[in-house]
């Protein structure tokens, strides 16, 4: 038994200078797990609650002492003495103790930090790397794959202080044979994009996720700049590198008139018009994945978009599904989208995260493991991507150490599996829905 003997919560600082929750779980035998909760900027309305103190005299109201207090008191009191290797039981104890639908009593930030720290401690007690332990929890021991990175190299929307409406323009180094080669290709395109932007007299400052955040005339101009950078780096767009976008459409959807208002371009679209706008971009550029291409509440619009684009483009639900199996189940039944973005702080525990990934895969949907715009050095999502053989990961650009921490962990994992004589496959474009 991997008996929990101590649980410690603390307030640490994330990549945006805001507090977040870190938890330590100590086991008999001296094994320790340490994990921190991430934080989002553009959030789905049905996400589990991130508990903030609201005390304007501390961190502008963003303190997390209440959540930390829950870790050190109620949660610690309930799980000390329990077996850390029973992840589902530990998570359920915290969920039941919280007693709310959206984890608003203790905060998903408190529950998740303890959930992940518990898994790390249990993995250490078994002498397993975290990805291997996650594969065991997932019911797929020894089944791994290295994920195709979706690298957010131009930031807009809520992730940047610029006039670009679409939140993320991403590259996928699909021509790579390994994760390490994919990162090299991504880095080379990133550095060439800096040169392209500089030559145009555009800003090369970076946004929350490490991508550039220039003011551009249109979303198409962002794609054109990336195309030029790919070619300058010596690669072929559509063969070596494909494109993906996160529209984060809820951020520019006007609920009063039902229009998608792209202020940066000075254009307004109905739901169906916006789908056809995206369809045109897909005809002009090799865009193989679109995230949140409609407002989270516009299920009729999503159904239409899935009908129009779903057989040739991966349509990822982020704000749409919020890593929630109840919502995902309804989406699957109604034929909404064909992929889910997995952010474990949207649901608030590792067990529930694994359930969402399994439900998606069983239904023929893909699962894209994702960071949040507010991150720390915690690299658990790298192990989650490998240990569930998800096939795809979104963890930012080729700058900011909070993003690079995840890529470096993937490098370590890929190398460790190769040295053990059990290399994990890198599926490239085959991992993307509709592209196999």
UniProtKB/Swiss-Prot annotation:
Superkingdom as given in the UniProt entry: Bacteria
How many and how are cofactors bound here?
A: Binds a second Mg(2+) ion via substrate during catalysis.
Q: Which residues bind (2R)-2-phosphoglycerate?
A: 167, 343, 372-373, 394
Which CDD domains does this chain map to? enolase
Give the residues annotated as active site.
209, 343
Q: Where does Mg(2+) bind?
A: 246, 291, 318
Cofactor(s) needed by this chain? Mg(2+)
GO terms under biological process: glycolytic process
Gene Ontology terms for molecular function: magnesium ion binding; phosphopyruvate hydratase activity
Entry keyword annotation includes Transferase: no
Q: Does the keyword Translocase apply?
A: no
Q: SMART domains, alphabetically?
A: Enolase_C, Enolase_N
Subunit comment for this entry? Component of the RNA degradosome, a multiprotein complex involved in RNA processing and mRNA degradation.
**What family classification does the UniProt entry report for this protein?**
Belongs to the enolase family.
Known function: Catalyzes the reversible conversion of 2-phosphoglycerate (2-PG) into phosphoenolpyruvate (PEP). It is essential for the degradation of carbohydrates via glycolysis.
PANTHER family xref list: ENOLASE (PTHR11902:SF1)
Protein name, as recorded: Enolase
* Organism of this sequence: Mannheimia succiniciproducens (strain KCTC 0769BP / MBEL55E)
- Quote the gene name from the UniProt entry: eno
């Amino acid at each position: 038994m991997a008996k929990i003997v101590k649980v410690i919560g603390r307030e640490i600082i994330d990549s945006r200078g805001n507090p977040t929750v870190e938890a330590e779980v100590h086991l008999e035998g001296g094994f320790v797990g340490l994990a921190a909760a991430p934080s989002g900027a553009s959030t789905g309305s049905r996400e589990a609650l991130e508990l903030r103190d609201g005390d304007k005299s501390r961190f502008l109201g963003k303190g997390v002492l209440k959540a930390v207090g829950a870790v050190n008191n109620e949660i610690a009191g309930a799980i000390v003495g329990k077996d850390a290797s029973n992840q589902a039981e530990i998570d359920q104890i915290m969920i039941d103790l919280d007693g709310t639908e959206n984890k608003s009593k203790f905060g998903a930030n408190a529950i998740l930090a303890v959930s992940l720290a518990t898994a790390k401690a249990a993995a250490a007690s078994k002498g397993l790397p975290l990805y291997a332990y996650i594969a065991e929890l997932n019911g797929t021991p020894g089944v791994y794959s290295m994920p195709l990175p979706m690298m957010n190299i131009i930031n807009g929307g809520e992730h940047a202080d610029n006039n670009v409406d679409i939140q993320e323009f991403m590259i996928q180094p699909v021509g790579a044979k390994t994760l390490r080669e994919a990162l090299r290709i991504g880095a080379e395109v990133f550095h060439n994009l800096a040169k392209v932007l500089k030559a145009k007299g555009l800003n090369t400052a970076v946004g929350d996720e490490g991508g550039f955040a220039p003011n551009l005339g249109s979303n198409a101009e962002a794609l054109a700049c990336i195309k030029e950078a790919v070619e300058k780096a010596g690669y072929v767009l559509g063969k070596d590198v494909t494109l993906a976008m996160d529209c984060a459409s809820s951020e520019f959807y006007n609920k009063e008139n039902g229009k998608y208002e792209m202020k940066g371009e000075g254009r307004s679209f109905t739901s169906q018009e916006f789908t056809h706008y995206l369809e045109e971009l897909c005809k002009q550029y090799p865009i193989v994945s679109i995230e949140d291409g409609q407002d989270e509440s516009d299920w009729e619009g999503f159904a239409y978009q899935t009908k129009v684009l779903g057989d040739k483009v991966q349509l990822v639900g982020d704000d749409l599904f919020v890593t929630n199996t109840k919502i995902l189940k309804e989406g699957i039944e109604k034929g909404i989208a064909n992929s889910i973005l997995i952010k474990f702080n949207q649901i608030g525990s590792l067990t529930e995260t694994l359930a969402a990934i399994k439900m998606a895969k069983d239904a023929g949907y893909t699962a894209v493991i994702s960071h949040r715009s507010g991150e720390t050095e915690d690299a658990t999502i790298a192990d989650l991507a490998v240990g569930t053989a998800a096939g795809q990961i979104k963890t930012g650009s080729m700058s900011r150490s909070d993003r690079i921490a995840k890529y470096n962990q993937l490098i370590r994992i890929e190398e460790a599996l190769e040295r053990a004589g059990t290399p994990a496959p890198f599926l490239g474009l085959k991992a993307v829905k509709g592209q196999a």
